[in-house]
Amino acid sequence: MLPARLRLLLLMLLAVGATDTLAQKAAIPSAVPPQQQQHTVQGIQQPVTPIPPLTEEDRAAAFPDLGGHPTHDKKVFSFVLFDQLEWRTGGETETVNWDMTGWIGGDVHRLWFRTEGETDEKRLHEGEAQLLYGRAFSRWWDFVAGVRQDIRPDPARTWAAIGIQGLAPQFFEVRATAYVGASWQTQARFEAEYEMLITNRLILQPRVEFNLSGKSDPERSIGSGLTSAEEGLRLRYEFRREFAPYVGISWNQKFGGTADFARAGGEATRATRFIVGIRAWF
């Protein structure tokens, strides 16, 4: 047997030879082209097939000319609201009342239509229609001007109308309109309402309306000054936003010379009425 020292020396020589062989193999370049290697030294995966350079045709295909972007600033819209379509009871007679507003146009210029009135099973007591041009002069307010035609009571009257309408602070919807008729007869009307959301669908709507006249009109039993006022509360439930039945109550009162004309004709000067109706828009 070989001495222990000789065996140790042979083992060391074999180890050194193996190390040199591995180093030589590592120094020999790989036969696989770099672009076909699957991973870099850091371990990042590389594509097997090289990526061709980006051309102008590639850019044009990725970003085609889409033309102008469509806008809606010139589009014509329309809206119709039956704010009141109701049956009233509790006064001298049972009546059906309506109050409808509609418009057609854009964000700034609109053509407005308003109509309201009262009828019973026998005849039309009150009825009027207004055609107005409206122009927005701020984000929340419109200027309106046009014509109003009174159908009832007799005799019929035609008025020039001018006013403003919009959303006041605290979200009160307001309409204030002045009217000028024949022989410089003047009238004015102020309306305001507010929507209180009890829930997202149950809404309480207080509303007030005041009417004034510049001078007496005996033919229509209207005195000068404050002629009449109406306050009301309506509670509606919106099954859909476009359709909501409601119940409510209203208080009507006549003042001054208008009240005198009513008393002379045997009519009451104030009344409390209960209301059932439908509010709808489209």
Task: For each feature predicted by the language model, list its residue ranges.
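Extracellular loop and loop/strand-boundary signature of outer-membrane beta-barrel proteins
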Residues: 116-119, 148-150, 161, 176-178, ...
